[in-house]
Every structure is written in C-alpha cells, then in structure tokens.
C-alpha cells in the first residue's frame, strides 16, 4: 500500500479506519505524518501506545475537515454499507489535496454475482460487517466516479489472502483457551472456523 501511495517523506496521510495501527506504524517509520481514525476506543488506546508519533483519533471519517496529501483505507469500505458509498467517496474527494492519491483496499465480489448478492444478507453482512456490503469492481468504480474520483489501478491478492485466513485460523485455534476464558463459547468458535 505504501508503494502504491507513492508518498514522500513528511507528506500527510489520512487513514480511514486505522484499526490496530499496523499501517500507521509503517507509515510513521517512513517519515509520513499520519492521522488515523477509528470508532473503537479499545483500538484507539492500543494504537496510541503502539504509534505515539501518529495523530490517532476517535472520530467518524465523515467528520473530517482537513485535507491530506494522501488517504488510505484498508478493509474498512466493506463495513460502510451501500447507501453510504456516496458519502464515503465524497469525503475522500474533499479530503484530498489537489494531486493527492488515495489507496482503498477492499474485499470485492464478482461483477456477475453482485446483483443477486445485494438482494440478501450473507455471512459477512450478518457477522463481520453488519450493515455492510462488499462492492463489485464495477460498482466500486462507478461509486467513486460519481464523486469525481478515478480508479487508476487494481491489484488482486486472493492467493495471498487465502494464506492470511489460514494463518488467522491457526492463531485463533492456538489462542482458543484464552478466548474461551473471556466467556466465548463453542458456538462462537464454530462461527469463526
């Protein structure tokens, strides 16, 4: 993502949905001025300790007032929900300085499956991104274009992501005794297997 951003040292980067601050940490190490937004107080507390040199905030992306050289959003778009796609892209458009670049990483669904998919609620919409919606590539491009944004490139990493999911499962199973001790039951365990 940093390579695709083509950011230079000391440029400003807004991260919409900074999560546990993995990207922010790398970006700060590269000399970028990072502002990260999250809606999770727990994530914010963790991230602020992990990356004290980043400006991390408990803030909704829609409340962004500043402009940035670049914007990054990593697997947050899926949680936005289709009715909010115009607001999401409008916020990116108004928050980018002229000539700025945004990199949005999103899980997508095939174009030929999108029309049927959007009629119902699947596992991801029910349990992972409640109220969210995976975009198809063409739906993503169209929503961005309506707000004056242009998609200049795409990168698919399905095989890499399959490995990521496999590693998450191994880590989940290894930590299951600790997770269970927090009060989560076998139904929860099966849900994420």
Stretches found by the model and what they are:
Residues 47-48:
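Conserved SAM-binding loop
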Residues 108-193:
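Substrate-binding/catalytic lobe of Class I Rossmann-like enzymes that use SAM or dcSAM, i.e.
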Residues 9-17:
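Conserved class I S-adenosyl-L-methionine
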Residues 51-61:
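Conserved SAM-binding strand-loop segment of SAM-dependent methyltransferases
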Residues 62-71:
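A short acidic, Gly/Pro-enriched loop at the edge of an enzyme's catalytic core
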Residues 99-106:
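Conserved beta-strand signature within the Rossmann-like core of class I S-adenosyl-L-methionine
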Residues 86-98:
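A short glycine-rich, Lys/Arg-flanked "PGG" loop and its adjoining helix->strand segment in the class I
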Residues 20-31:
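Conserved SAM-binding loop of SAM-dependent methyltransferases across substrates and taxa
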